[in-house]
Amino acid sequence: MMGVNSSGRPDLYGHLHSILLPGRGLPDWSPDGGADPGVSTWTPRLLSGVPEVAASPSPSWDGTWDNVSGCGEQINYGRAEKVVIGSILTLITLLTIAGNCLVVISVCFVKKLRQPSNYLIVSLALADLSVAVAVIPFVSVTDLIGGKWIFGHFFCNVFIAMDVMCCTASIMTLCVISIDRYLGITRPLTYPVRQNGKCMPKMILSVWLLSASITLPPLFGWAQNVNDDKVCLISQDFGYTIYSTAVAFYIPMSVMLFMYYRIYKAARKSAAKHKFPGFPRVQPESIISLNGMVKLQKEVEECANLSRLLKHERKNISIFKREQKAATTLGIIVGAFTVCWLPFFLLSTARPFICGTACSCIPLWVERTCLWLGYANSLINPFIYAFFNRDLRTTYRSLLQCQYRNINRKLSAAGMHEALKLAERPERPECVLQNSDYCRKKGHDS
């Protein structure tokens, strides 16, 4: 039940904190000894029951706050829980490393994939690979021992710098990929990156430099990380929190959503523009007449025009399919990115305003769930691109089957097969007239 303070008003503060932060020392609404009985004042009081919480079955909240700032919440796991959690975290780490290594190897060693637009995918894979190698193992160890940081003060700052830079680089690369896809679809002839491979490395370098701009301030005194013997937490300074979350997430997410909207709009416009109503059918009466030869000549000319129209429409259909595929791919990328990272950044933005700048008062399991959901984005990125890219799929399959020598040949054969499929549609004039009596008669005579 919700408590009532001395003035008769509902005790909203105590009610909310009893739900969000159980077992934590909370202020109590109680009149101070010399104060007016009608005025409530803050009198800190530690809640009872901490020993009971610490003695609960594993996994359980430790319930002790081991430093002055109130940081250091820990979870005591039993042996079975540690085995299950450790196995899951190890599997996530290994799959992330394997998937992103496949991307890097595929683009670097397969000639057909060495295109400027694929450099962005390599940059994304390197960022995600860095997360899996330099960040996730230390988070895994910290989580397995209940949330206590054991790697020291100096390495805490190094770890936070690596975590922020790699995750931000991954997010910003996804943003640049969305811009690249949009320009490639809407400006295929004028988009310079497609023709000039020198521009793409500059864009990638800009992404990593901007990511470093978020990493460096805590190292040079603008905002100090929360760092003691048991806690390693990024700075909770209000200004730095707003700056870092905006640059690392909210602005890139807004750009990605806008690019997806523009590609989706272009695909719908292309679908409406290139609808093919069908060819006009030639009536038999127009062929079988007294002036049959003249009529036939006119119909042959009309069929030739329709054949050219068919070629043009086939090209339009190819453009439409490419736009539709780009819209679908980018939509799934944006959706997965938002689902993975939005909870973490909402929590990171709100945390200083809820808990203050000294430490985090959010339950440890909530923070870790949101954090691992964000790390999962580094796992699924290479599989998303492989699912929508036939060349990457073929290369993955060949690498996993240790068939290294025939990769380029297989990609060339697959590309030729796709081109032949597009050219399979009939173009002969008499095929347009196949419903006419003349064509049926000609086929019967032959």
Swiss-Prot record:
Any Pfam family hit: 7tm_1
Intervals, Cytoplasmic compartment: 110-119, 180-199, 262-327, 389-446
Disulfide bridge positions per record: 156-232
GO molecular function annotation: G protein-coupled serotonin receptor activity
InterPro entries: 5HT_7_rcpt, GPCR_Rhodpsn, GPCR_Rhodpsn_7TM
PROSITE patterns in alphabetical order: G_PROTEIN_RECEP_F1_1 (PS00237), G_PROTEIN_RECEP_F1_2 (PS50262)
Cellular compartments annotated: Cell membrane
Name this protein carries in UniProt: 5-hydroxytryptamine receptor 7
Species per Swiss-Prot/TrEMBL record: Cavia porcellus
Organism lineage string: Eukaryota, Metazoa, Chordata, Craniata, Vertebrata
